[in-house]
Regions:
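Active-site His/Glu-centered metal-binding helix of metallohydrolases
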Residues: 435-436
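Hydrophobic packing positions in regular secondary-structure scaffolds
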Residues: 1-266
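Alpha-helical transmembrane segments and their membrane-interface boundaries
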Residues: 255-405, 409-423, 427-431, 440, ...
Length: 453
């Protein structure tokens, strides 16, 4: 058992013991002494009754610290264990973007009730955040940031930072606005601290800044933050007024979420599915992909059926053709994975990246030759037929070239038409390498059949 798993088990056991013993003071101290992330992970293993008891003996501040680090499923379970008034009290210790995420997961009726119970200014901010889809810049932004007028002196800006800084998640980047409230640039906290206190904020403002609109997809926002190494990126409307900011910790969550989603979708599994998903839901989520795979499997089967007569005369073909198609599938997956990753971080332009396409073809020739020769030697030893070995080499080269071509083009074409390459690429690439791999190998065998018998 790894040290990390052992630590998780110890946290879970200790947390459960304190809850069962109703040790409120010890539990509160435990939360303060440990990273809230570790506490949230331990809380995932609690049943609903234990979670309710945990909420009943903890202060709203302690629950808030755990809620901010909890995953979506645990947050939903927490809301079931808390009354509306208890939630409102907890929200007073949480960031607005986290509050919006939690409220967004509530039933419509309860969501309206809680929003209506909020103070006017909080209600306005949360309502604005809830307007945007969860996977957009507006959906993940926070309205807690520091904006300072350009006509204020640096010393006045410092006073404002001292006043509201403790409530703000990111204070390293200060946003500078004009008299109309429009964003005109940013200022680093380091520059503010080291500058003459009597100069204007406008004098230390960097006007070359990156901003995004509230409708931008969270994955595109993550690319910008990564590309320009930002700690926070402002979200602005058409008038360049700041609506909020997306912080780097939210971007990390986005990257993890998108990575997990891509891994699941490449396997034909929906991001909505988990171990707790009901049997009926799992069937609905998985069956469509399995049916698509069934169709592609029949395509490969029909290709083999065309050459049934050839296979009947040279039985060895049946064992070798699976090697050819399998190697093609693996090679195609390699190229496809590289392209999907490249598309996720930067757009791929065939006119610009044609050299990479040619490289994949040559790579298919070289890898096909090496693997084909190794396979051919084994085939010749086993079946004592040199011509069968030669056909194996040619087919291996051909199928790995096919794998390189389709592994490159399929993700690019899918992305061009607005489809997610991570979801559908593998089906088309595997189908191509299976069907064409069988066709090349069995077609050659049919042509040179007299030499194989």
């Amino acid at each position: 058992m790894s040290e990390e798993i052992l630590k998780e088990n110890m946290n879970e056991e200790r947390l459960r013991h304190m809850i069962e013993a109703s040790e409120a003071a010890e539990l509160s101290e435990y939360i303060k002494e440990n990273n809230p992330i570790d506490v949230a992970q331990a809380a995932e293993y609690l049943d609903d009754e234990e979670l309710w008891k945990m909420c009943s003996i903890l202060s709203s501040e302690d629950i808030a610290s755990v809620l901010e680090q909890a995953d979506d499923d645990l947050r939903v379970r927490f809301t079931y264990a808390l009354s509306n008034n208890e939630l409102l009290e907890i929200f007073s210790s949480m960031a607005q973007d986290d509050i919006a995420d939690i409220i967004g997961d509530l039933t419509i009726g309860r969501r309206k009730t809680i929003v209506n119970l909020m103070k006017d200014n909080d209600r306005t901010e949360i309502t604005n955040l809830l307007e945007y889809p969860a996977d957009t810049a507006g959906g993940i932004m926070t309205t807690a940031y520091i904006a300072i007028r350009e006509d204020l002196k640096v010393i006045e800006g410092l006073e404002k930072i001292r006043e509201i800084g403790p409530k703000i998640e990111v204070i390293e980047t200060i946003f500078v606005v004009n008299a109309r409230g429009q964003l005109i640039g940013t200022a680093d906290l380091r520059d503010i601290l080291s500058s003459d206190k009597n100069i204007l904020m406008a004098d230390i403002t960097k006007e070359n800044f990156i901003s995004v609109g509230p409708e931008m997809d969270q994955e595109e926002v993550a690319k910008l933050v990564s590309k320009y190494d930002l700690k926070a990126i402002p979200v602005v409307n058409q008038r360049m007024a700041i609506l909020g900011i997306v912080t780097v910790d939210d971007i990390i969550d986005v990257i993890v979420e998108e990575y997990n989603e891509d891994i699941l979708e490449m396997g034909g599994v929906s991001k909505e599915e988990s171990l707790d998903t009901t049997l009926l839901q799992s069937i609905k989520l998985r069956l469509p992909w399995l049916l698509i795979n069934l169709i592609t499997a029949f395509m490969a089967s029909f290709t083999v059926k065309v050459f049934e007569g050839t296979i009947a005369q040279v039985v060895a073909l049946s064992s070798i053709m699976t090697i050819i198609s399998g190697m093609g599938g693996n090679a195609g997956s390699q190229t496809q994975s590289i392209l999907v990753r490249q598309i996720a971080t930067d757009k791929v332009d065939f006119k610009r990246d044609w050299k990479s396409f040619v490289k994949e073809i040559f790579l298919g020739v070289i890898n096909g030759t090496v693997n084909g020769l190794i396979t051919a030697i084994i085939v010749i030893i086993l079946y004592r037929n040199v011509f069968l070995g030669v056909i194996t080499v040619i087919a291996m080269i051909g199928n790995l070239v096919v794998a390189g071509i389709f592994g490159f083009l399929v993700p690019v074409i899918l992305d061009k038409f607005g489809a997610d390459p991570a979801v559908s690429s593998s089906i088309f690439v595997t189908t191509a390498t299976d069907v064409l791999g069988f066709f090349i190998f069995l077609g050659l065998a049919n042509i040179f059949l007299p030499m194989l018998i």
